[in-house]
C-alpha cells in the first residue's frame, strides 16, 4: 500500500479552477500567508483566489496588491463577501475566538449562494464545544455545502506511513501507547509580541485544544479507533510568565496566564482495549537531547516511534522509526508530494526468533522514515487542498476504513473522513474531537474517569 503518493489529479483539470475567497488573508508574516496562500500557489491550476474579506477595505485591497492577486475582489462586508457569486470555496483563517461569529455569519448570509460549495475552517472550529455544535448543526442544513476542518496532521507523510504499517499488521496487535509532548510557549516564558488570547483559557486556544488536540486526533487516526473511556488531570502551575524581548532574551517584565501548562491523560481505545498514557507540558525541554514530541506505539510483533522537534504534530517535520514485520505491500515510493527524496534506512535484524511472538529472523525489519526538504507547515495543508481538488474534479473517494466498516457517504457530501486514508477531515470530525477535549476538561473538574464511547456522531 502506498498512500504517500501525489494527488490523483496529476494533470491540469479541463474545467476552471476552484474559486477561493479568504477571510483573514493579509500579506506579511500572518499564519495564513505562510501556509494556505503558499499551498494554493503550488496548486494554481486547481485553485484561484478571487475574493478577500478583511475588516477594512483598505486592508483587503493592500493585500491584493502586495500578493499580486490579479483575479481577486476586496470586501469589507462579510455579508457581501458570503453572497459573492464567483466564490466556490471560503477559507476562514482568523483567531479562534472569532470563528463562531465569522462562520455563523457566512453560513447565514450565503444560504442563497448556490455557487458556494466548500467551507474550510482552521482548527479549532470554535472556542467551545457548544459553539462548535451550533455551527455544525447549521452547516448540516446546507445540503450542497461541503465542510472541511484543518486537522492537517492527518496528512503528514509520517502519520500516513505509520497508519499504513499499523493497518497492514506490521507491528501486530497494539498493546500500549505512550505520548509525551512540550507545548511551546505555555511554560515559564513567552515572546513579548505573542498574542494574549493564546494564554486565555476562555479563547479556546490552549495546550489541550491545540497541542494535545492535534496529537490525539492523529493518534486516533493512526490506530483507527476512538476512545472508550478517559481520565485527565489539568494544572496551571505557571500562572505568571516572563516576557522575552525581540532577541529571545528574558526581561524582568512578567504577565499572567490562565490556560493550563500541564496535562496528564489516560485512556482506553475502543479497538483492542489499548491503554494510552499521555503527558503534555508547557515550555521546551531543558535537556537538548530531549525531543519535544514522542509517540511510542508498542505491538505484539514490533514497535513504532514518532519524534518531533516541536510539540505540535501538525506542523512538525517528524521522524518515524519502525521495527517489526516486513510487509511486501507496505513499501513507500520514497518521495513526498513535492518529489523530495525520502531517507529510508532499512536493516535486517539479526536476532533469534522471539518465543513470545514466534517471529523469525527473516521476517523482521527496521526502518527510519524521514523526508528531506519537506516543509510540514505548508506541506500538510497543501495535502488537504490536494484532497479537496481530487474530490471536486474526480468525485468522492469510495474506499472504506482500514480497520473495519465505516459510515456510508452521503449522496452528495463527504460526511466525515473518520479513519480513511482518502478524503479530508470535516466539521463532523471536528465535533468528535471537540467533544473529546470537552470530556478531558470535565474529567479533571469532576475528578473521575468518563465514558466517551457515545461522543461519536
Curated annotation (Swiss-Prot):
**GO molecular-function annotation terms?**
DNA binding; nucleotide binding
Region feature Disordered, mapped onto this chain: 333-364
What GO terms describe the biological role, i.e. biological process, of this protein? galactose metabolic process
Gene3D superfamilies per the record?
Answer: Dihydrodipicolinate Reductase, domain 2 (3.30.360.10), NAD(P)-binding Rossmann-like Domain (3.40.50.720)
Coiled-coil residues are: none
| SUPFAM superfamilies in UniProt | Glyceraldehyde-3-phosphate dehydrogenase-like, C-terminal domain, NAD(P)-binding Rossmann-fold domains
Keywords carried by this UniProt record = Carbohydrate metabolism, DNA-binding, Galactose metabolism, Repressor, Transcription, Transcription regulation
Q: Which domain of life is it from?
A: Eukaryota
Q: Which Pfam families does the record cross-reference, listed alphabetically?
A: Gal80p_C-like (PF22685), GFO_IDH_MocA (PF01408)
Family that this chain belongs to: To yeast GAL80.
Described by its record, this protein's role is as follows: This protein is a negative regulator for the gene expression of the lactose/galactose metabolic genes. It seems to block activation by the transcriptional activator LAC9 in the absence of an inducing sugar.
Protein's UniProt name? Galactose/lactose metabolism regulatory protein GAL80
- Species per Swiss-Prot/TrEMBL record: Kluyveromyces lactis (strain ATCC 8585 / CBS 2359 / DSM 70799 / NBRC 1267 / NRRL Y-1140 / WM37) (Yeast)
The gene name reads: GAL80
Amino acid at each position: 500500500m502506498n498512500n504517500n503518493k501525489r494527488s490523483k489529479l496529476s494533470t491540469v483539470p479541463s474545467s476552471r479552477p476552484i474559486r477561493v475567497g479568504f477571510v483573514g488573508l493579509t500579506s506579511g508574516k500572518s499564519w495564513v500567508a505562510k501556509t494556505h496562500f503558499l499551498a494554493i500557489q503550488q496548486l494554481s491550476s486547481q485553485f484561484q483566489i478571487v475574493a478577500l474579506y478583511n475588516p477594512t477595505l483598505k486592508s483587503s485591497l493592500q493585500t491584493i496588491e502586495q500578493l499580486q492577486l490579479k483575479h481577486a475582489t476586496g470586501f469589507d462586508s462579510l455579508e457581501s463577501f458570503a453572497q459573492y457569486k464567483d466564490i466556490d470555496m471560503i477559507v476562514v483563517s482568523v483567531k479562534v475566538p472569532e470563528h463562531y461569529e465569522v462562520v455563523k455569519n457566512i453560513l447565514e448570509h450565503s444560504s442563497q449562494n448556490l455557487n458556494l460549495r466548500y467551507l474550510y475552517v482552521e482548527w479549532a472550529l470554535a472556542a467551545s464545544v457548544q459553539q462548535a455544535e451550533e455551527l455544525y448543526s447549521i452547516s448540516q442544513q446546507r445540503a450542497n455545502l461541503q465542510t472541511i476542518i484543518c486537522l492537517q496532521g492527518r496528512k503528514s507523510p509520517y502519520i500516513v506511513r505509520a497508519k499504513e504499517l499499523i493497518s497492514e499488521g506490521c507491528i501486530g496487535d497494539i498493546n500500549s501507547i505512550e505520548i509525551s509532548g512540550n507545548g511551546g510557549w505555555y511554560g515559564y516564558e513567552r515572546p513579548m509580541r505573542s498574542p494574549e488570547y493564546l494564554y486565555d483559557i476562555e479563547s479556546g486556544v490552549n495546550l489541550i485544544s491545540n497541542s494535545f488536540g492535534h496529537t490525539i486526533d492523529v493518534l486516533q487516526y493512526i490506530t483507527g479507533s476512538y476512545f472508550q473511556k478517559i481520565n485527565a488531570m489539568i494544572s496551571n502551575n505557571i500562572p505568571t510568565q516572563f516576557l522575552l524581548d525581540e532577541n529571545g532574551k528574558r526581561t524582568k517584565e512578567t504577565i499572567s496566564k490562565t490556560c493550563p501548562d500541564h496535562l496528564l491523560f489516560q485512556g482506553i481505545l475502543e479497538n483492542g482495549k489499548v491503554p494510552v498514557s499521555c503527558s503534555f507540558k508547557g515550555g521546551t525541554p531543558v535537556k537538548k537531547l530531549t525531543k519535544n514530541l514522542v509517540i511510542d506505539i508498542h505491538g505484539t510483533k514490533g514497535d513504532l516511534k514518532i519524534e518531533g522537534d516541536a510539540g505540535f504534530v501538525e506542523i512538525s517535520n517528524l521522524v518515524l522509526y519502525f521495527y517489526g514485520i516486513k510487509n511486501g505491500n507496505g513499501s513507500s515510493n520514497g518521495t513526498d508530494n513535492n518529489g523530495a527524496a525520502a531517507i529510508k534506512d532499512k536493516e535486517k535484524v539479526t536476532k533469534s526468533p522471539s518465543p513470545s511472538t514466534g517471529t523469525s529472523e527473516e521476517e523482521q525489519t527496521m526502518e527510519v522514515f524521514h523526508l528531506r526538504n519537506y516543509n510540514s507547515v505548508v506541506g500538510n495543508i497543501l495535502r488537504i487542498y490536494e484532497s479537496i481538488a481530487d474530490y471536486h474534479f474526480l468525485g468522492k473517494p469510495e474506499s472504506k476504513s482500514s480497520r473495519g466498516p465505516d459510515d456510508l457517504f452521503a449522496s452528495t457530501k463527504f460526511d466525515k473522513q473518520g479513519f480513511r486514508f482518502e478524503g479530508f477531515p470535516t466539521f463532523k470530525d471536528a465535533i468528535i474531537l471537540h467533544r473529546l477535549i470537552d470530556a478531558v476538561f470535565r474529567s479533571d473538574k469532576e475528578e473521575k474517569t468518563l465514558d466517551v464511547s457515545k461522543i461519536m456522531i
